[in-house]
């Protein structure tokens, strides 16, 4: 199997899909990454855990429709070209 641009894009799509399907109450709260985490005081930078939670929330919010479109295109391409 050759390492091509298509396989790189497909791996990135799988990673974004993995982030998008993480459910907050079912999975993230069980490992201690729920929304009840406090964000430090005024002037303090948020920790890495809260930054990762913001990233996961942002990916789920912003990438919902584009992921549906890109996943559909990928499925059609795989069906057509194997």
UniProtKB/Swiss-Prot annotation:
Gene Ontology terms describing biological process: brain development; cell maturation; chromatin organization; endoplasmic reticulum organization; gene expression; glucose homeostasis; insulin metabolic process; negative regulation of apoptotic process
Listed InterPro entries: Yos1 (IPR013880)
Superkingdom, taxonomy of origin: Eukaryota
Keywords: Endoplasmic reticulum, Membrane, Protein transport, Transmembrane, Transmembrane helix, Transport
UniProt keyword annotation of Cell inner membrane present: no
Subcellular location: Endoplasmic reticulum membrane
Transmembrane regions listed in the UniProt entry: 2-22, 62-82
One Pfam family linked to the record: Yos1
GO-annotated cellular components: endoplasmic reticulum membrane; Golgi apparatus
Membrane topology type: Multi-pass membrane protein
Protein's job: Regulator of endoplasmic reticulum secretion that acts as a key determinant of brain size. Required for secretion of extracellular matrix proteins. Required for correct brain development by depositing sufficient extracellular matrix proteins for tissue integrity and the proliferation of neural progenitors. Acts as a regulator of the unfolded protein response (UPR).
Assigned protein family: Belongs to the YOS1 family.
Record's protein name: Immediate early response 3-interacting protein 1
Originating organism: Mus musculus
């Amino acid at each position: 199997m050759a390492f091509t641009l298509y396989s790189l894009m497909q791996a990135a799509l799988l990673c974004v899909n993995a982030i998008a399907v993480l459910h907050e109450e079912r999975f993230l709260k069980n490992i201690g990454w729920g929304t009840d985490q406090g964000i430090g005081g005024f002037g303090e930078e948020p920790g890495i855990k809260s930054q990762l939670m913001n990233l996961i929330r942002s990916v789920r919010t912003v990438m919902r429709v584009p992921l549906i479109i890109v996943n559909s295109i990928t499925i059609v391409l795989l069906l057509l070209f194997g």
